[in-house]
Amino acid sequence: MTSALELRHVSKVYGSGPTEVHALRAVNLSVEREELVAVMGPSGSGKSTLLTIAGSLEEASIGQVLVDGVDLASVSRADQARMRRRSIGYVFQDFNLLPGLTAVENVTLPLELDGVRAKTARASGLKALEALDVAERADRYPDELSGGERQRVAIARAIVGERGLLLADEPTGALDSVNGEAVMRLLRSATQRGVAGVVVTHEAQLASWADRVVFLRDGQVVDQTVAPSGPDSLLAASDRR
Protein backbone atom coordinates (compact mmCIF):
# COMPACT_ATOMS: atom_id res chain seq x y z
CA MET A 1 0.00 0.00 0.00
CA THR A 2 1.26 3.48 -0.89
CA SER A 3 1.99 5.69 2.11
CA ALA A 4 0.29 9.07 2.29
CA LEU A 5 3.71 10.62 3.00
CA GLU A 6 7.17 9.15 2.64
CA LEU A 7 10.56 10.76 3.19
CA ARG A 8 13.50 8.76 1.87
CA HIS A 9 16.99 9.66 3.08
CA VAL A 10 16.06 13.36 3.20
CA SER A 11 18.75 15.86 4.15
CA LYS A 12 18.58 19.64 4.21
CA VAL A 13 21.66 21.86 4.25
CA TYR A 14 21.62 25.65 4.57
CA GLY A 15 24.64 27.74 3.60
CA SER A 16 28.06 26.39 2.68
CA GLY A 17 31.58 26.22 4.01
CA PRO A 18 32.05 27.47 7.58
CA THR A 19 28.41 28.66 7.76
CA GLU A 20 26.95 25.34 6.62
CA VAL A 21 24.08 24.08 8.76
CA HIS A 22 22.67 20.56 8.50
CA ALA A 23 19.01 20.98 9.44
CA LEU A 24 18.07 17.40 8.51
CA ARG A 25 20.33 14.38 8.13
CA ALA A 26 19.17 11.32 6.15
CA VAL A 27 15.66 11.29 7.56
CA ASN A 28 13.44 8.33 6.70
CA LEU A 29 9.78 8.60 7.64
CA SER A 30 6.50 7.18 6.36
CA VAL A 31 3.01 8.16 7.47
CA GLU A 32 -0.03 6.09 6.62
CA ARG A 33 -3.64 7.09 6.18
CA GLU A 34 -5.57 7.07 9.45
CA GLU A 35 -2.34 7.68 11.36
CA LEU A 36 -1.41 10.69 13.50
CA VAL A 37 2.33 11.09 14.03
CA ALA A 38 3.76 13.52 16.58
CA VAL A 39 7.27 14.92 16.08
CA MET A 40 9.16 15.95 19.21
CA GLY A 41 12.66 17.19 19.90
CA PRO A 42 14.62 20.12 21.32
CA SER A 43 14.68 23.54 19.68
CA GLY A 44 16.75 23.47 16.51
CA SER A 45 16.38 19.72 16.01
CA GLY A 46 14.80 20.13 12.55
CA LYS A 47 11.12 19.64 13.36
CA SER A 48 9.77 22.63 11.41
CA THR A 49 12.15 22.01 8.51
CA LEU A 50 10.82 18.47 8.26
CA LEU A 51 7.28 19.81 7.90
CA THR A 52 8.09 22.45 5.29
CA ILE A 53 9.91 19.88 3.16
CA ALA A 54 7.14 17.30 3.61
CA GLY A 55 4.64 19.91 2.43
CA SER A 56 6.65 20.98 -0.64
CA LEU A 57 7.30 24.45 0.75
CA GLU A 58 11.04 23.79 0.65
CA GLU A 59 13.14 21.41 -1.42
CA ALA A 60 15.31 18.74 0.14
CA SER A 61 19.04 19.03 -0.52
CA ILE A 62 19.22 15.25 -0.85
CA GLY A 63 16.59 12.52 -0.89
CA GLN A 64 13.01 12.02 -2.02
CA VAL A 65 9.65 13.25 -0.75
CA LEU A 66 6.60 11.32 -1.93
CA VAL A 67 2.98 12.34 -1.36
CA ASP A 68 0.53 9.56 -2.25
CA GLY A 69 3.38 7.89 -4.09
CA VAL A 70 4.22 10.93 -6.23
CA ASP A 71 7.83 12.13 -6.03
CA LEU A 72 7.50 15.89 -5.62
CA ALA A 73 10.76 16.48 -7.48
CA SER A 74 9.32 14.73 -10.55
CA VAL A 75 6.46 17.18 -11.13
CA SER A 76 6.41 20.81 -12.25
CA ARG A 77 6.14 23.71 -9.82
CA ALA A 78 2.59 24.31 -11.06
CA ASP A 79 1.65 20.72 -10.28
CA GLN A 80 3.33 21.00 -6.87
CA ALA A 81 1.22 24.08 -6.13
CA ARG A 82 -1.91 22.20 -7.22
CA MET A 83 -1.00 19.29 -4.93
CA ARG A 84 -0.50 21.69 -2.03
CA ARG A 85 -3.98 23.14 -2.52
CA ARG A 86 -5.79 19.86 -3.06
CA SER A 87 -3.92 17.30 -1.02
CA ILE A 88 -2.14 19.02 1.88
CA GLY A 89 -3.50 21.07 4.75
CA TYR A 90 -1.11 23.24 6.78
CA VAL A 91 -1.19 24.85 10.20
CA PHE A 92 1.83 26.99 11.06
CA GLN A 93 2.91 28.85 14.17
CA ASP A 94 2.26 32.29 12.66
CA PHE A 95 -1.22 31.36 11.31
CA ASN A 96 -0.60 32.85 7.80
CA LEU A 97 -4.08 34.37 7.61
CA LEU A 98 -4.69 37.00 4.92
CA PRO A 99 -5.63 40.27 6.67
CA GLY A 100 -7.98 41.45 3.91
CA LEU A 101 -10.19 38.37 4.12
CA THR A 102 -12.68 37.41 6.80
CA ALA A 103 -12.22 34.25 8.84
CA VAL A 104 -14.51 32.18 6.63
CA GLU A 105 -12.98 33.65 3.46
CA ASN A 106 -9.53 32.59 4.69
CA VAL A 107 -10.86 29.08 5.29
CA THR A 108 -12.55 28.76 1.91
CA LEU A 109 -9.86 30.36 -0.26
CA PRO A 110 -8.15 27.04 -1.19
CA LEU A 111 -11.52 25.59 -2.20
CA GLU A 112 -12.42 28.56 -4.38
CA LEU A 113 -9.00 28.52 -6.03
CA ASP A 114 -9.82 24.94 -7.02
CA GLY A 115 -13.10 25.98 -8.61
CA VAL A 116 -15.57 25.17 -5.82
CA ARG A 117 -18.61 27.45 -6.02
CA ALA A 118 -18.63 30.22 -3.43
CA LYS A 119 -21.89 29.09 -1.77
CA THR A 120 -20.68 25.50 -1.44
CA ALA A 121 -17.27 26.63 -0.22
CA ARG A 122 -18.82 28.89 2.43
CA ALA A 123 -20.99 26.05 3.74
CA SER A 124 -17.90 23.84 4.06
CA GLY A 125 -15.97 26.67 5.71
CA LEU A 126 -18.68 27.35 8.27
CA LYS A 127 -18.84 23.65 9.12
CA ALA A 128 -15.09 23.57 9.75
CA LEU A 129 -15.28 26.73 11.89
CA GLU A 130 -18.20 25.29 13.85
CA ALA A 131 -16.18 22.16 14.62
CA LEU A 132 -13.63 24.44 16.27
CA ASP A 133 -16.23 26.53 18.12
CA VAL A 134 -15.44 29.73 16.25
CA ALA A 135 -18.27 29.90 13.68
CA GLU A 136 -19.73 33.00 15.35
CA ARG A 137 -16.57 34.88 14.28
CA ALA A 138 -16.82 33.78 10.64
CA ASP A 139 -17.28 37.27 9.22
CA ARG A 140 -14.63 38.96 11.36
CA TYR A 141 -11.22 39.93 10.02
CA PRO A 142 -8.03 38.46 11.51
CA ASP A 143 -7.14 41.66 13.40
CA GLU A 144 -10.53 41.44 15.15
CA LEU A 145 -9.78 37.95 16.48
CA SER A 146 -7.81 36.84 19.51
CA GLY A 147 -4.67 34.77 19.07
CA GLY A 148 -6.54 31.61 19.98
CA GLU A 149 -9.32 32.40 17.53
CA ARG A 150 -6.84 33.03 14.72
CA GLN A 151 -5.21 29.69 15.47
CA ARG A 152 -8.55 27.90 15.26
CA VAL A 153 -9.32 29.61 11.94
CA ALA A 154 -5.95 28.43 10.61
CA ILE A 155 -6.76 24.87 11.67
CA ALA A 156 -10.20 25.09 10.05
CA ARG A 157 -8.54 26.12 6.78
CA ALA A 158 -6.26 23.08 7.00
CA ILE A 159 -9.05 20.55 7.53
CA VAL A 160 -11.65 21.94 5.10
CA GLY A 161 -12.21 19.92 1.94
CA GLU A 162 -10.92 16.44 1.21
CA ARG A 163 -7.19 16.79 1.79
CA GLY A 164 -5.38 13.56 2.56
CA LEU A 165 -2.38 14.97 4.45
CA LEU A 166 -2.43 17.38 7.38
CA LEU A 167 0.78 19.06 8.60
CA ALA A 168 0.64 21.07 11.82
CA ASP A 169 3.51 23.00 13.44
CA GLU A 170 2.72 23.68 17.12
CA PRO A 171 -1.00 24.02 16.30
CA THR A 172 -1.99 24.60 19.93
CA GLY A 173 0.62 27.23 20.75
CA ALA A 174 -1.85 30.10 21.23
CA LEU A 175 -4.50 28.03 23.01
CA ASP A 176 -5.15 27.15 26.63
CA SER A 177 -4.98 23.53 27.74
CA VAL A 178 -8.70 22.87 27.26
CA ASN A 179 -8.76 24.22 23.70
CA GLY A 180 -5.41 22.58 22.99
CA GLU A 181 -6.89 19.20 23.87
CA ALA A 182 -9.90 20.01 21.67
CA VAL A 183 -7.61 20.71 18.71
CA MET A 184 -5.75 17.42 19.16
CA ARG A 185 -9.08 15.63 19.41
CA LEU A 186 -10.07 17.22 16.11
CA LEU A 187 -6.80 16.22 14.43
CA ARG A 188 -7.30 12.71 15.74
CA SER A 189 -10.83 12.67 14.36
CA ALA A 190 -9.53 13.77 10.95
CA THR A 191 -7.09 10.86 10.80
CA GLN A 192 -9.86 8.44 11.72
CA ARG A 193 -11.64 9.63 8.57
CA GLY A 194 -8.67 8.58 6.42
CA VAL A 195 -6.36 11.60 6.70
CA ALA A 196 -2.65 11.21 7.49
CA GLY A 197 -1.47 13.72 10.08
CA VAL A 198 1.92 14.98 11.24
CA VAL A 199 2.01 17.37 14.19
CA VAL A 200 5.05 19.06 15.70
CA THR A 201 4.70 19.70 19.42
CA HIS A 202 6.85 20.09 22.50
CA GLU A 203 3.98 19.18 24.83
CA ALA A 204 3.91 15.56 25.97
CA GLN A 205 0.26 15.88 26.98
CA LEU A 206 -0.66 16.65 23.37
CA ALA A 207 1.75 14.19 21.76
CA SER A 208 0.10 11.42 23.75
CA TRP A 209 -2.89 11.78 21.40
CA ALA A 210 -0.77 10.49 18.50
CA ASP A 211 -0.45 6.92 17.27
CA ARG A 212 3.30 7.23 16.98
CA VAL A 213 5.98 9.64 18.18
CA VAL A 214 9.13 10.49 16.22
CA PHE A 215 12.04 11.95 18.18
CA LEU A 216 14.46 14.30 16.38
CA ARG A 217 17.83 15.48 17.59
CA ASP A 218 20.41 17.45 15.56
CA GLY A 219 18.43 16.83 12.38
CA GLN A 220 18.31 13.06 12.81
CA VAL A 221 15.54 10.67 13.75
CA VAL A 222 16.87 9.11 16.93
CA ASP A 223 13.81 6.98 17.64
CA GLN A 224 10.24 6.22 16.61
CA THR A 225 7.83 4.62 19.02
CA VAL A 226 4.17 3.91 19.54
CA ALA A 227 2.91 6.76 21.71
CA PRO A 228 3.12 5.65 25.36
CA SER A 229 -0.11 5.82 27.31
CA GLY A 230 -0.05 9.17 29.05
CA PRO A 231 2.24 12.21 29.07
CA ASP A 232 4.40 11.03 31.98
CA SER A 233 5.42 7.92 30.03
CA LEU A 234 6.11 10.04 26.97
CA LEU A 235 8.29 12.47 28.90
CA ALA A 236 10.28 9.57 30.29
CA ALA A 237 10.73 8.15 26.80
CA SER A 238 11.87 11.55 25.50
CA ASP A 239 14.39 11.96 28.32
CA ARG A 240 16.03 8.67 27.39
CA ARG A 241 16.84 9.90 23.86
Residue ranges and their predicted role:
Residues 2-216, 221:
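ABC family nucleotide-binding domain
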Residues 220-241:
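Conserved beta-strand-loop-alpha-helix hinge in the C-terminal portion
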